[in-house]
Amino acid sequence: MFRNLTEQIDNSVCVYCLKSDIPTSTTDIPTSTTPMTTSAPTTTMPRTVCQSCTLDATTVIMVHPSAKPFTSDTIDDTQTCAIRTLVCDARSPGGDVLVSFNRDDSGSTGGPNTFTTILNCNDDMQWTLSGIVITEIECQSA
C-alpha cells in the first residue's frame, strides 16, 4: 500500500513521496512453518464416442396400460464405453415386471419383483442390448 508522506528519506527531503509498505529486506518478510505442497498434474483422457450416449438416445415410453416409470435410470461413463442401468420394480411385493424393447419388436423380458436392464453405448452413440439398437424402452407391472 502506498501513502503520501513528507519525510526525510536517504538524507533528502521528500514532499508527497510514495512510500511502500512492501518489506525491503528478508528480515521484514513474515515466515511460515507450513510446508508447501504440490500435486502431480492430472491428465484427462478425451472421451470416446461410445462414452457419450445420453439418456434421450433411448426414449422411455409409457404406452401399455400397465406401464410405469423406471425406479432408476443411470449412466456410468467411467468405463471404456458408457453403460446405462434401468431398474423396473413391481408395483406391489411379489408382483411381476416386464421390460419391453422397441415396443416388443426387439423382445421383452422380466421377472418377479424387480428387473434390471443393462444397455451399452455403441460408436454411433446409440444404446444397445445384445447388439440391437434400443430406441424405446418401457417398464410394465400389473
Curated annotation (Swiss-Prot):
Pfam family, one: C6
Protein name (record): Uncharacterized protein R07B1.7
Organism: Caenorhabditis elegans
